[in-house]
UniProtKB/Swiss-Prot annotation:
Name of protein: Glycine dehydrogenase (decarboxylating)
Keywords for the protein's UniProt record, in alphabetical order: Oxidoreductase, Pyridoxal phosphate
The family this protein is said to belong to: Belongs to the GcvP family.
Quaternary structure and interacting proteins, as annotated: The glycine cleavage system is composed of four proteins: P, T, L and H.
Reactions catalysed according to its record: N(6)-[(R)-lipoyl]-L-lysyl-[glycine-cleavage complex H protein] + glycine + H(+) = N(6)-[(R)-S(8)-aminomethyldihydrolipoyl]-L-lysyl-[glycine-cleavage complex H protein] + CO2
Function: The glycine cleavage system catalyzes the degradation of glycine. The P protein binds the alpha-amino group of glycine through its pyridoxal phosphate cofactor; CO(2) is released and the remaining methylamine moiety is then transferred to the lipoamide cofactor of the H protein.
Modified residues (N6-(pyridoxal phosphate)lysine): 706
GO MF assignments: glycine binding; glycine dehydrogenase (decarboxylating) activity; pyridoxal phosphate binding
Gene Ontology CC: cytosol; glycine cleavage complex
CDD domains on file: GDC-P (cd00613)
InterPro entries assigned to the protein according to its UniProt record, in alphabetical order: GcvP, GDC-P_C, GDC-P_N, GDC_P, PyrdxlP-dep_Trfase, PyrdxlP-dep_Trfase_major, PyrdxlP-dep_Trfase_small
Top-level division of the source organism's lineage: Bacteria
Documented EC number(s): 1.4.4.2
Length: 954
């Protein structure tokens, strides 16, 4: 009997699309040399050996041919022109603002800032760490609370994180009710309801000015200050009453208002949350924007997200790094305080620079100007006989319309291309902002048949709530108010950071590929970045068309039937996908299904997300080859049987291989009634070659900031849409704009998440076309195998798949070097900085290893440079092993070597300055200098300082 051979990949990998050769770094002349090293005659032959035959896609992706950059931009411009940019005074936490041109051009549109990765390697990230420390100082000063994080995803998510922190802090009491003021932003309340349900928390809306509140069994209270509808009232008595009963109090607030109003910390709040969007970040139809989270010192170890702290380096210099990392999900896993990793660093940097540029006086002047125009608007309305709901306010009015019918007001507003907020009781809301002019005030009054009136008195702020305490006194907020000064400050910080403009960033599981300029240009178009997220949908027809087209493209690429673009980070995609699974089981009367199987190799966000979704995490073992232990999986699936909710699996695996048993694994889970959740972090190895929806996954999140070219921004923004099979489609997260009948609530504040960066992924797919995307995947796999092959004589490759090949990344085992030379993986990571490279992923998923992902965008010359650096470092280690170099005083243990270190006299090390700083010939042409020597992380955690307590840059 003849055994049929597995089907061979017949997909076309050749394309004439102009952009593909720009995106892919490997040239036609490079290809034969690289394949020859691997022992293959063609790219197809290599891919057939890597991809398991049972999952290979046997047809081309049904996507259009790739367009030229000019044609793609013209096509996108046609969509953008379908959006209508009206004057929006809707408020609800979203405001028009002015992005200073010096910040727009030199940060938001600058690849030196937006192509950086999360600052794990702090010695080559001092610039963005300083900008984030400025952000933390800004938030801490304005909120009056001791400690603030380096950004969260949006205001509603920050409020949900505050709820969770409060719940965990009061867990011993057994309380499960969270009181929420009914004048909070409605989108915040919606996200809170979503997050509360799986945790068994009951959301109780309350009237903050009512007499007695339902305190019984409550653990926390959320207040909005100023209120969503504009009221400014003191929360102090309510906070004190809550504290008497053991509740923690969160205040959602507005940073600009806090330049004039007493800060929440002074009023007794335990936590303050909000958005920094109006500090120079465009509306963007809802995002991305940097939220903030500030709290008392007591809760520093429960703080969600990332935290920048001050320490010192080996030379005694002040240096910055990420603090208290042991509390984060990648270490704490299911015990983590939050699942958030990527947040909104780029937007936090923009907001911090806005504050640096304007300084405390400039910010106060902006706030006073907005308030005075709101006062004049109020006076005109009152003179015309309209009743204001509140006599004290900052920038927002709620107006009783009297005899003016709402339809008439809407008609007048539409004729003037103005958006207002309309309440269910027939009143209207107007929120003014930095861009509002006197003419705008007159136009608004005209809608009501009113005219500007004389203003008696000064402001309309409560006397007891006027801010007296100083803020932003640090020199960084005083010294850079001219454009030249700020430009040089921005450039000085940028020069301290290694980005993709410097060299390859070979971080495994991070996919640091090209973020092409043509893909990035549209984020600055006003048709995309000046729409309010709650503007009527007919004003956003271009966006809606883009959403439909992008969702259809992603559905074709993944094999799923429906896509939600709402999740604004990979972590939120995971959470949303698990909520979909939970809701599906509940709809079938199987609410007991709450067990989530997760391999021990999984990224820490997986178990953290599962716990947030109300699931019990059960670990599944991996075998010696790094694959899921199928026998252990089957046994646990059987054990939990009708309690099995889901399996979370990454594919290719976090160990960098295509597991051949993936179909069997999915079948086992389905046999016991569970659903398969696939983490799409490694989708860059699948596009065009296989589709998760075809081989058994029921739901999958994608990282558009990895596979689909949204830049990492130094730690955000990210986008994590989810794809689902048809049976799960009814349970996708709903939005407030288009109710879908789903019982799964929204997971983000804005209906479409980080809408304004979705054009980046649309552009990437449109430029590449189906064949171009498939070729990119094949080249990414080729590059990873090329590096593995070149480095294997020097460092063992820990895991391999069929035919001795890896997927799109490889893991080098450095553990033997600790015994032979006393060298840790950190030493190699720091020494790579001296060679001009960012380290690969350190000690994950296996401690003592490096995981390398080169992507398809790097040239062969850059791959070779990286390999030569790694080989040279191995030679340095060999000298230690041979006793030629000292085990402590050697170039690795002392790395990195900043310029200041080289100026040391007398030179104290047993190797030359040249070996320290110029260990490779290419460094003589261009040398990237680490800003500081090796940082003492432990000191920084023991002596936690997370604000600008003294000058950082002179």
């Amino acid at each position: 009997m003849m055994v049929s051979s597995p089907p061979q990949l017949e997909i076309n990998l050749e394309t004439d699309a102009e952009f593909v050769a720009r995106h892919i770094g490997i040239t036609p002349s490079d290809l034969p040399k690289m394949l020859s090293l691997l022992g293959y005659g063609s790219l197809k032959e290599l891919i057939n050996a890597v991809i398991p035959p049972e999952i290979r896609l046997q047809r081309p992706l049904a996507l259009s041919e790739g367009l030229s950059e000019t044609a793609a931009l013209q096509k996108l411009r046609t969509l953008a022109q379908q959006n209508q940019v009206w004057r929006s005074y809707i408020g609800m936490g979203y405001y028009n603002c002015i992005t200073p041109s010096v910040i727009q051009r030199n940060i938001l549109e600058n690849p030196g800032w937006y192509t950086q990765y999360t600052p794990y390697q702090a010695e080559i990230a001092q610039g963005r760490l300083e900008a984030l420390l400025n952000f933390q100082t800004l938030v801490s000063d304005l909120t009056g609370l001791a400690i603030a994080n380096a950004s969260l995803l949006d205001e509603a998510t920050a409020a949900a994180e505050a709820m969770t922190l409060s719940f965990n802090a009061c867990r011993q009491r057994g309380a499960n009710r969270f009181l929420v003021a009914q004048d909070c932003h409605p989108q915040t309340l919606a996200v809170l309801r979503t997050r509360a349900l799986p945790l068994g928390i009951q959301i109780v809306p309350i009237d903050p000015i009512a007499g007695e509140l339902p305190w019984e069994n409550a653990f926390g209270l959320l207040l909005q200050y100023p209120a969503s509808d504009g009221a400014v009232r003191s929360p102090q008595a309510l906070i004190a009453a809550a504290h008497e009963r053991g509740l923690l109090v969160t205040v959602a607030t507005d940073l600009l208002a806090l330049t004039l109003l007493r800060p929440p910390g002074e009023l007794g709040a335990d936590i303050a949350v909000g958005s920094s969007q109006r500090f120079g970040v465009p509306l963007g139809y809802g995002g991305p924007h940097a939220a903030f989270f500030a709290t008392r010192e007591d809760f520093k170890r429960q703080l969600p997200g990332r935290l920048v702290g001050v320490s010192h380096d080996a030379l005694g210099q002040r240096a910055l790094r990420l603090a208290l990392q042991t509390r984060e999900q990648h270490i704490r896993r299911e015990k983590a305080t939050s699942n958030i990793c990527t947040a909104q660093v780029l937007l936090a940097v923009v907001a911090s620079m806005y504050a640096v540029y304007h300084g405390p006086d400039g910010l106060r002047q902006i706030a006073e100007r907005i308030h005075q125009r709101t006062v004049r608007l109020a006076a005109g309305l009152e003179a015309a006989g309209y009743q204001l709901y509140y006599s004290e306010f900052f920038d927002t009015l709620r107006i009783g319309l009297g005899n003016l019918p709402v339809p008439v007001l809407k008609e007048r507003a539409a004729a003037a291309r103005i958006n207002l907020r309309y309440f269910d009781d027939g009143s209207a809301g107007i929120s003014l902002d930095e861009t509002t002019t006197e003419k705008d005030v007159a136009d608004l009054l005209a809608l009501f048949g009113a005219r500007p009136a004389e203003v008696e008195g000064g402001d309309r702020l409560p006397a007891a709530l006027k801010r007296q305490s100083p803020y932003l006194q640090h020199p960084v907020f005083q010294d850079y108010h001219s454009e030249h000064a700020l430009l040089r400050y921005i450039h000085r910080l940028q020069a301290k950071d290694l980005s993709l403009t410097t060299s390859m960033i070979p971080l495994g599981s991070c996919t640091m590929k090209l973020n092409a300029t043509a893909e990035m240009l549209p984020i600055s178009w006003p048709e995309f970045n000046q729409l309010h997220p709650f503007a009527p949908q007919e004003q956003a027809q271009g966006y809606q068309a883009l959403f439909r087209e992008l969702a259809a493209m992603l559905a074709e690429i993944t094999g799923f039937d429906a896509i939600s673009l709402q999740p604004n980070a990979g972590s939120q995609g995971e959470y949303a996908g698990l909520l979909v699974i939970r809701q599906y089981h509940h709809s079938r009367g199987e609410s007991q299904r709450n067990v989530c199987l997760i391999p021990t190799s999984a990224h820490g966000t997986n178990p953290a997300s599962a716990v947030m979704a109300g699931m019990q995490v059960v670990a599944v073992n991996c075998d010696a080859q790094g694959n899921i232990d199928v026998a252990d999986l089957a046994a646990k699936a059987e054990t939990y049987g009708d309690r099995l909710a889901a399996l979370m699996i990454t594919y290719p695996s976090t160990h960098g291989v295509f597991e051949t048993g993936i179909c069997q694994i999915c079948d086992i889970i389905h046999r016991y009634g569970g659903q398969v959740y696939m983490d799409g972090a490694n989708m860059n190895a699948q596009v065009g070659l296989c589709r998760p929806g075809d081989f058994g996954a029921d739901v999958c999140h994608l990282n558009l900031h990895k596979t689909f070219c949204i830049p990492h921004g130094g730690g955000g923004p990210g986008v994590g849409p989810i794809g689902v099979k048809a049976h799960l489609a009814p349970f996708l997260p709903t939005t407030q704009v288009i109710p879908q009948g789903s019982e799964t609530g929204p997971v983000t504040a804005a209906p479409w998440g980080s809408a304004s960066i979705l054009p980046i992924s649309w552009m990437y797919i449109t430029l590449m076309g189906g064949v171009g995307l498939t070729r990119a995947t094949a080249i990414a796999i080729l590059n990873a195998n090329y590096i593995a092959k070149r480095l294997e004589p020097y460092y063992p490759v820990l895991y391999k798949g069929a035919h001795g090949l890896v997927a799109h990344e490889c893991i080098l085992d450095l553990r033997p070097l600790k015994k032979s030379a006393g060298i840790e993986v950190e030493d190699i990571a720091k020494r790579l900085m001296d060679y001009g490279f960012h380290a690969p992923t350190v000690s994950w998923p296996v401690p003592g290893t490096l995981m390398i992902e080169p992507t398809e965008s790097e040239t062969k010359a850059e791959l070779d440079r990286f390999c030569e650096a790694m080989i040279a470092i191995r030679s340095e280690i060999a000298e230690i092993e041979a006793g030629v170099s000292d085990r402590q005083q050697n170039p690795l243990k002392n790395a990195p070597h900043p310029a200041l270190m080289l100026a040391t006299e007398p030179w104290p090390y047993p190797y030359s300055r040249e070996v320290a700083a110029y260990p490779a010939p290419w460094l003589r042409e261009y040398k990237f200098w680490p800003a500081v020597a090796r940082i003492d992380n432990a000191y920084g955690d023991r002596h936690l300082v997370c604000t600008c307590s003294m000058p950082l840059t002179n």
